[in-house]
């Protein structure tokens, strides 16, 4: 499914066409200043390609924040137009709405080959289909209005390109409702689909999944789906304590214990056995007497267990040593979830050592993919983004793909 979608590279005839590009400019803006421009920079290859191919107008649409279907200047995309202007080295026309006669007229009047940024899609309740009214009450958009909004977006251009992988799991109007004949992925979306297709549909083996995160119950769907695909699985992070307590009757002190998740541990291990998947769990832990970077700490083995009133906050050195061979002999690695509370420097070592091993196996030619969210933040923090095959830009979207779900924004693209 992922590999057979039309992409921007397949489009031969863009010259003199108006192109509508759904991008992800959901960036943190404080007092009109953009705090992180990564998502804007990431769209430049798609925009520059369309300019080079002679597109008549390049019309960018995006959401930003959660204005809930109401106009809210806090979430205006105007500052993004300024940043984009600096990055492209040319004027970017900003329009203060994203649909309607005035927008259509201004697009048509704009100069050839120009870049136009429209205002936040989510200022219209029809984008998400729900929001709040002026009094803060929850409201739903009616079907006719949603249909009209989608038709109004469709009217703006001749070709549609979706480059917003981070929103691909949302069936919002701009993701699934543009009714143009040609709907292709941009370079960002294309790269995401290619890497996930390599890992999930046609992997080089052995295929390893490294999972972390707090709750087993949040990751059940993920674990079950990956057990159908992988050869090996490392289960670490907060959810490891639930596994260790259930499987080894280990004392876990005040470490995270997921009551609901604990009931499924047996079933997960049964499935792993049936599917011939090796499961690796930590065997030692860095523990603390408080959830605090400056807490007292010590290392314990799983045999010793964690004393009362202490909690496990990172994997210990023996665990990482055990993972070394597992990681370095894998040909494909999917990593979703850190091994400890890496946000606190004293409990980051397990995750950082794990990252270094993933970097090492990438150098040996393995394909390595980091799902969005916390693990991507860790890679960013350690400045290792260029040393991993692919760091996903979509937390929720990549998680749903790994869970085996189809993404509405991807399904809506044209097939090759």
From Swiss-Prot:
> What GO MF terms are annotated?
ADP binding; ATP binding; metal ion binding; phosphoglycerate kinase activity
The entry's AMP-binding residues are 214-215, 219, 238, 312, 343
Binding residues for (2R)-3-phosphoglycerate, per the UniProt record? 23-26, 38-39, 62-63, 65-66, 121-122, 169-170
Q: Does the keyword Metal-binding apply?
A: yes
Cofactor field: Mg(2+)
> What chemistry does it catalyse, as a reaction equation?
(2R)-3-phosphoglycerate + ATP = (2R)-3-phospho-glyceroyl phosphate + ADP
Q: State the superkingdom.
A: Eukaryota
Q: Which SUPFAM superfamilies match?
A: Phosphoglycerate kinase (SSF53748)
Question: Where ATP is bound, by residue?
Answer: 214-215, 219, 238, 312, 375
Biological pathway: Carbohydrate degradation; glycolysis; pyruvate from D-glyceraldehyde 3-phosphate: step 2/5
Q: What keywords were assigned to this record?
A: ATP-binding, Glycolysis, Kinase, Magnesium, Metal-binding, Nucleotide-binding, Transferase
| Binding-site residues for CDP, renumbered to this chain | 213, 218, 237, 337, 342
Name the UniProt record assigns to this protein: Phosphoglycerate kinase
The enzyme's E.C. designation: 2.7.2.3
Q: Name one GO biological process term.
A: glycolytic process
What's the subunit arrangement here?
Monomer.
Q: Which GO terms describe its cellular component?
A: cytosol
**Residue positions binding Mg(2+):** 214, 218, 374
């Amino acid at each position: 499914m992922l590999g057979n979608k039309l992409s921007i590279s397949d489009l031969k005839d863009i010259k003199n066409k108006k192109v509508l590009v759904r991008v992800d400019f959901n960036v943190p803006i404080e007092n009109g200043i953009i705090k992180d421009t990564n998502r804007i920079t990431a769209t430049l290859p798609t925009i520059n390609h369309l300019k080079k191919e002679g597109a008549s107008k390049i019309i960018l649409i995006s959401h930003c924040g959660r204005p809930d279907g109401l106009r809210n200047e806090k979430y205006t995309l105007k500052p993004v137009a300024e940043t984009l202007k600096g990055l492209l080295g040319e004027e970017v026309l900003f329009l203060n709405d994203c649909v309607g006669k005035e927008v259509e007229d201004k697009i048509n009047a704009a100069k050839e080959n120009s870049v136009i940024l429209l205002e936040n899609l989510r200022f219209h309740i029809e984008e998400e289909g729900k929001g709040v009214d002026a009094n803060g009450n929850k409201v739903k958009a009616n079907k006719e209005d949603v249909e009209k909004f989608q038709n109004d977006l469709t009217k703006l251009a001749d070709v549609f390109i979706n480059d917003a992988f981070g929103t691909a799991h949302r069936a919002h109007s701009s993701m699934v409702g543009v009714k143009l004949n040609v709907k292709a992925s941009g370079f960002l979306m294309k790269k995401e689909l290619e890497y996930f297709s390599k890992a999930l549909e046609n992997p080089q083996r052995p295929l390893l999944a490294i999972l972390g995160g707090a709750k087993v119950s949040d990751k059940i769907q993920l674990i079950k789906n990956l057990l159908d695909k992988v050869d090996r699985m490392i289960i670490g992070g907060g959810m490891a304590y639930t596994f260790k307590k259930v499987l080894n009757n280990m004392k876990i002190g005040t470490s995270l214990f997921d009551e609901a998740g604990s009931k499924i541990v047996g079933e997960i291990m049964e499935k792993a056995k049936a599917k011939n998947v090796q499961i690796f769990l930590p065997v030692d832990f860095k523990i603390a007497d408080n959830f605090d970077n400056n807490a007292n700490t010590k290392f314990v083995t799983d045999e010793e267990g964690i004393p009362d009133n202490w909690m496990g906050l990172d994997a210990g050195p023996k665990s990482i040593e055990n993972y070394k061979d597992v990681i370095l002999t894998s040909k494909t690695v999917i990593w979703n979830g850190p091994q400890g509370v890496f946000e606190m420097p004293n409990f980051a070592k397990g995750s950082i050592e794990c990252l270094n091993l993933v970097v090492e196996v990438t150098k040996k030619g393995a394909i390595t993919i980091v799902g969005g969210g916390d693990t991507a933040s860790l890679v960013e923090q350690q400045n290792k983004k260029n040393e991993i095959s692919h760091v996903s830009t979509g937390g929720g979207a990549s998680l749903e793909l790994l869970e085996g779900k189809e993404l509405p924004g991807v399904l809506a693209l044209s097939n090759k």
